[in-house]
């Protein structure tokens, strides 16, 4: 493995239990190093055999995070983007399935010259080569790699072996391991217990890896005595035992780690001396707004299909935190399963009392669709601010067709292939697609916004780029009928063929989009649609009439370049060729609970 000069590597592992927050830790460290002037790349290694999480159920994996270049990735990449305010890519997520697939493909091509293909060296070398490629293709000072899973899992062993070999080759000054562990608080004894951490480090040592820094998650702050004890039994300097007790919000984690001097310990161990003091004024102000808003609170319902597992809507929930801060309000989110509203006895007035906005979330498959349509109808008829995303836009189109355009049998061909009025239909270029994984319309595409619309008002521009993940689209055969009944098609593809945004003008806020705006909302760049929607809910809570949008800084959505616009404008009318040629996807099989 040829390593570019001067690139330093940080690997983040986890022990004791899963879900300790390795992604938040990695993102926080990346943000702190970036704030000191370093160029940081961050990536996630997942040990599962799936090529990507695109075909995995939301109940098992949570949200699938889509990047600009059309990669379907782990939700931790969302944390990376939100904390670092930088876009990730296909290179930012590597699964063991992708590694094995690459090795097997090479073997079939005869790349190993008749040799016996083994985990060592071939699989390990593939992992190391992927990391070297990332370093070579970017101008980075530090590359942070989060290894998914928990120490002791058999699936993670190849990644750990690759890290061990790299550290042996590069030396301690070029690669370090941060191990995240759990120090439980036993209430009966009023004590923090370090034994689980000791055993976790012992298991890591069995792989040949001595952790350089320990970050200890705990309910209570770690005393200096506890840190000395952990350091003594884990063969780590007590200065390298970092306490990370529970925070009120994940956005306080970087501030806690800064206070614990994690970034300084990393810089010292890697021999990085040229850096500046971090400027975290904006970050502190943001956390203060999240914890102590001064303009009241709003309650927003998220109607979805996977509401038992909030991680399925991770980016939506985080976008509401950003939009709450930008509107100086506390946003309370209530997750409601769409199937509940399919019961004729469902009392919307009682169940939605005190609700100031309704968001109908993305999803796949026909389960709960009629419930989503019912929620949309209630929001439209009662003048409650409404926001639909992806499937939410498609359901809004079905509802409008049935109850406003008098097309009672309107539906999407995803749910009824013989629908009398197929207002939502499979995209033309998808009709010959047979494979599920890696075949949807994925990644960033442009959208032209119509002047004088709500979309134009919140974006403050006419050309935007947004991320997509879908196969079905609005059927243009019904555009004229919809417009005659008051629907505004406020955003389309540059060639005008694909509907991207719809809205109703005589409504406080009724906006639905085919793309996924939640994937581009960040701490330092709140998404304008979420900002506008929460602003509408805030006004609805106060006076119940047409909202006045709160002011927002104009820097949050970078303008596409003229070259990008020209490239998109030259697409065919069917838009069959993606700007990113390696896009992929899948659909309804993820809804394992249909």
From Swiss-Prot:
L-glutamine binds at residues 59, 363, 391-394, 414, 471. One of its GO terms (biological process) is pyrimidine nucleobase biosynthetic process. Pathway: Pyrimidine metabolism; CTP biosynthesis via de novo pathway; CTP from UDP: step 2/2. It catalyses: UTP + L-glutamine + ATP + H2O = CTP + L-glutamate + ADP + phosphate + 2 H(+); L-glutamine + H2O = L-glutamate + NH4(+); UTP + NH4(+) + ATP = CTP + ADP + phosphate + 2 H(+). Residues 562-594 are annotated as: Disordered. The gene is pyrG. NCBIfam families: PRK05380.1, PyrG. Allosterically activated by GTP, when glutamine is the substrate; GTP has no effect on the reaction when ammonia is the substrate. The allosteric effector GTP functions by stabilizing the protein conformation that binds the tetrahedral intermediate(s) formed during glutamine hydrolysis. Inhibited by the product CTP, via allosteric rather than competitive inhibition. HAMAP family: PyrG (MF_01227). Residues 299-543 form the Glutamine amidotransferase type-1 domain. It is an enzyme of class 6 (ligase). GO terms for cellular component: cytosol. ATP binds at residues 19-24, 76. Mg(2+) binds at residues 76, 146. InterPro entries: Class_I_gatase-like, CTP_synthase, CTP_synthase_N, GATASE, GATase1_CTP_Synthase, P-loop_NTPase. Residues 1-272 are annotated as: Amidoligase domain. CTP binds at residues 18, 153-155, 193-198, 229. It comes from Chlorobium phaeovibrioides (strain DSM 265 / 1930) (Prosthecochloris vibrioformis (strain DSM 265)). Keywords: ATP-binding, Glutamine amidotransferase, Ligase, Magnesium, Metal-binding, Nucleotide-binding, Pyrimidine biosynthesis. Residues 584-594 have a biased composition (Basic and acidic residues). It holds the Pfam family CTP_synth_N. CTPSs have evolved a hybrid strategy for distinguishing between UTP and CTP. The overlapping regions of the product feedback inhibitory and substrate sites recognize a common feature in both compounds, the triphosphate moiety. To differentiate isosteric substrate and product pyrimidine rings, an additional pocket far from the expected kinase/ligase catalytic site, specifically recognizes the cytosine and ribose portions of the product inhibitor. Homotetramer. This is CTP synthase. Belongs to the CTP synthase family. UTP binds at residues 18, 193-198, 229. Signal peptide: none annotated. CDD domains: CTPS_N, GATase1_CTP_Synthase.
